[in-house]
Amino acid sequence: MKPAILPKLMLGLSLAAMTTAAHATDDAFEVWLNPSIEYDLSKHDSIELETAQRFRSASDGRADTYFVWAWLHHDLNETFTLSGALEQRENDGGFDEVRMIQQLSSKHGFIRTRVRLEERWVEDQSRMGFRIRPRLGVVVPINDSGDWSFRTDAELFLTVRSTSKGGQDGLTGLRTQFGVAHDVNDKLSLSLTYLRQQDFHDNAPDRVGHAPLIGVSYTF
């Protein structure tokens, strides 16, 4: 990638979040954790158990949420990885959710892309929902050894079919994040990221969460 392209791309990701400032928002502070373990089945295949915990304030209607994903990854080549997962989401107060996920991710120099498809079943909702989540990001090494890196990305939530009749479709969310990651060794990676999650609402203020995201990943 030419050096001049990188600042422009990073500026574009930042502007994606800034353009939402004109909308009325309901903001709150949250804490997100994202530990995971992965095991290599072969040179090109691996399984991963990923979890996430989102701690929020119940007083403003934001329940704590707990996730677990069972992933199967297959490296198609050095650029593309195809993945599938089953996800279980538990919300304090109900409306738990099960998702089937298909995902294609890629690496192009500094550029990272990901497209995720989700089939969603939400407790007490009338039908299966379908959502597309495209993500564009940048990963830049910040030391000579390459074990420290800066990363940023922006992800859209495109709801093709809501989980209930009359539910909101179209662009329903935007997630942006930036932070640093450190490869402690060949097996252990740590990351600390600022994450901003904005859920768009047609007839109400957009709901925005601001969270430090702490990631821990271990590979066997």
Please provide the spans of the model-predicted regions.
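Outer-envelope beta-barrel architecture signal
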Residues: 27, 43-47, 78-80, 109-115, ...
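Outer-membrane beta-barrel transmembrane domain signature
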Residues: 74, 109-110, 116-202, 218-220
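N-terminal signal peptide c-region/cleavage motif recognized by signal peptidases
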Residues: 19-21
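Surface-exposed strand-loop-strand hairpins of Gram-negative outer-membrane beta-barrel proteins
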Residues: 49, 53-65
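Transmembrane beta-strands of outer-membrane beta-barrel proteins
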Residues: 32-38, 46-52, 69-73, 81-87, ...
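Residues that define the transmembrane beta-barrel architecture of outer-membrane proteins
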Residues: 29-31, 64-66, 96-100, 126-132, ...
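Bacterial N-terminal signal peptides that target proteins for export
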Residues: 1-10
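Outer-membrane beta-barrel domain signature
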Residues: 23-26, 56-61, 89-95, 122-127, ...
